[in-house]
Curated annotation (Swiss-Prot):
This is Cell adhesion molecule CEACAM16. GO terms for cellular component: extracellular space; stereocilium tip. GO terms for molecular function: identical protein binding. Belongs to the immunoglobulin superfamily. CEA family. Disulfide bonds join C155-C202, C253-C294. Its main location: secreted. GO terms for biological process: sensory perception of sound. PROSITE patterns: IG_LIKE. InterPro entries: CEA_cell_adhesion (IPR050831), Ig-like_dom (IPR007110), Ig-like_dom_sf (IPR036179), Ig-like_fold (IPR013783), Ig_sub (IPR003599), Ig_sub2 (IPR003598), Ig_V-set (IPR013106).
Amino acid sequence: MKMPLTWYSWFLLSAWILNTGAEISITPEPAQPAEGDNVTLVVHGLSGELLAYNWYAGPTLSLTFLVASYIVSTGDETPGPAHTGREAVRPDGSLDIHGALPGHTGTYILQTLNRQFQTEVGYGHMQVYEILAPPTVMANDTALVERRDTLRLVCSSPSPAEVRWFFNGDALPVAVRLGMSPDGRMLTRHGVRREEAGAYQCEVWNPVSVSRSEPLNLTVYFGPERVAILQDSTTRTGCTIKVDFNMSLTLWCVARSCPEPEYVWAFNGKALKNGQDHLNISSMTAAHEGTYTCIAKNSKTLLSGSASVVVKLSAAAVAMMIVPVPTKPTEGQDVTLTVQGYPKDLLVYAWYRGPASEPNRLLSQLPSGNWIAGPAHTGREVGFANCSLLVQKLNLTDAGRYTLKTVTLQGKTDTLEVELQVAPLE
């Protein structure tokens, strides 16, 4: 039968004579219990015939810390103020704790009384470890600008535990580049770098439990850097690209940047309506010669960069020649007699059907840029500023020799001929 301790009983217990020669030790089993485990505080070194035990959960023999008193002869156990409802004293003096909680962590004292009314005291310590919940990685921001912003990561966990950090799944070296707080729960990087973009996790652990957070993904904005213009299958010397007449050319703008930059193209200093990373020239002519500039802009870093190339007709294309497009037109089609390498200082030109004589003149272009029809004009011919001639809706009688005559501002005259073939419809 459990009897409450009277004031007189407590007086007797406090008046016991201490036996200083005793060596009582207390060890928990299991040695590293997890919350919820059943734990026994096993007593070693008891000697002689004992009358009673007092268990304390605290640093001193104070009534406040008394868990229970136990009378050996009767088996009576009396709970004390520190009893949680989970403790029970064994006849051998050991203390059972059912479903131990982290709050049971601390110093335990066993006080014994023998028949000579001498007391012995033993001390022990027990650490009850929590089953850890997953922590959370928190950041001051998950999208930062390189070399401008500061990164702060915090591993948030309600439980005291050791902390490890992981970057892209691998253990993060101890503060090689990132400053770590003394408790390991905060990482700080002033002037964050692009190499530090990726997935961060933290892991909390104790001897009985390990738990890792979900990844937190960090983006670091940078650039644009190393802006360059690339091209496919053309001859390039330094910043000059040479292209054959009537050939196509694609210019690509590349840059190192996060996020991908916005692109603006300019031709001879004038902006083009093209927001793509590439620029196409479908058919190279003298009108396409000039300086092409790509400007890359990063909306996050507010930085920009540019690159330029000079595009020219190749040397082989400079000599004036006439190329029909298409090269083998059929009856009913339109054909353009495209002029390659026409004079840059052109004053006037004239097209003839056959030899360059007035009756054969199809049309002429005046210095004003307008063209006028000649005696041989059929109403299907159109002239262009680059000296090209369009003949619409071909018939078989359009086949034959065509002559182009040009006059420059310096008075230089050139004559060039081409033979046009028209295939009949099948």
